[in-house]
Amino acid sequence: MTSPVNVDVKLGVNKFNVDEDSPHIILKTDPDKQALEVLVKACPAGLYKKQDDGSVRFDYAGCLECGTCRILGLDTALEKWEYPRGTFGVEFRYG
């Protein structure tokens, strides 16, 4: 019998090379609140976090580059979404 897969453990083996000089995702100055709520629930990496005061905090480090937030929030919450520059971003590792 096999043991259940722990997603956090599987994601933990991925390597992230974060481009500190050029973020590949930028939120709008005044993003739509409902769109942010959707992103909080939809992001598989959990990068959109609701704070105690109701605001949403976002950090692009740890992005899986899946495009979920691009599809759901490009016109309403995001100013920019593009893949990271060459040699930057996520390197998926299986283990």
From Swiss-Prot:
- Keyword set includes Lyase: no
| Organism domain of life | Bacteria
Which residues are connected by disulfide bridges in this protein?
none
Keyword Magnesium belongs to the record = no
A GO molecular function assigned to this protein is: iron ion binding
Please provide the record's keywords in A-Z order: 4Fe-4S, Electron transport, Iron, Iron-sulfur, Metal-binding, Transport
- Residues annotated as coiled-coil are none
Report the function annotation for this chain: Could be part of an electron transfer system required for anaerobic carnitine reduction. Could be a 3Fe-4S cluster-containing protein.
Q: Which family does it belong to?
A: Belongs to the bacterial-type ferredoxin family. FixX subfamily.
What is this protein identified as?
Ferredoxin-like protein FixX
Q: Which gene encodes it?
A: fixX
